[in-house]
Design a protein with these regions (language model features):
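Non-heme di-metal
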Residues: 4-155
């Protein structure tokens, strides 16, 4: 599998860590949980930026993003509680970070002597996305504490 194909997976692949999966999941959750929906929507907007940038990069590599292989079966929107949704999202963000870090390492291994210009751009893009995903983990972790406190009051 070439690097461009791995970017397709990150972009809209039928995997839980794709940007399209994240966009759909967060926007669906926004409608399910009014009290924390705006946070989910804010994160979804950032995921949309990732989706856009990855699509641009795939185009720069000569790929086309007009024929998605996406399946909505990767999206989970049935939850017992807001706390469960937040936990699922934290894990998805962590899994996404790990997937992008693996992709960065693969790019480096494929360019052991000197990074090509496209490899350098790819790593910069992925590092920016990883940074954003780490912010999402922090935001969601804080949200998890808040939701747990709220749900504890209701019990």
């Amino acid at each position: 599998m070439c690097i461009r194909d791995r970017f397709y997976d990150a972009y809209y692949g039928a995997i839980p860590t794709s940007e399209l999966t994240a966009i759909i999941q967060y926007t669906q959750q926004r409608m399910l949980f009014e009290n924390i929906g705006e946070t989910f929507l804010g994160i979804a907007f950032v995921e949309m930026k990732h989706f856009d940038r990855l699509g641009d990069f795939i185009g720069q590599l000569g790929g086309r993003v007009n024929t998605p292989k996406y399946s909505s079966s990767a999206v989970t929107v049935e939850y017992e509680s807001a706390a469960e949704a937040v936990r699922v999202n934290i894990q998805a963000e962590k899994d996404t970070i790990a997937a992008y870090q693996q992709l960065i390492e693969r790019i480096r291994k494929n360019n052991p002597e000197k990074l090509t210009q496209s490899a350098t751009v790819a790593i910069q893009l992925l590092n920016k996305i990883v940074s954003d995903e780490r912010v999402h983990v922090r935001i969601l972790s804080e949200l998890a504490q808040s939701v747990a406190a709220e749900e504890g009051k209701e019990a």
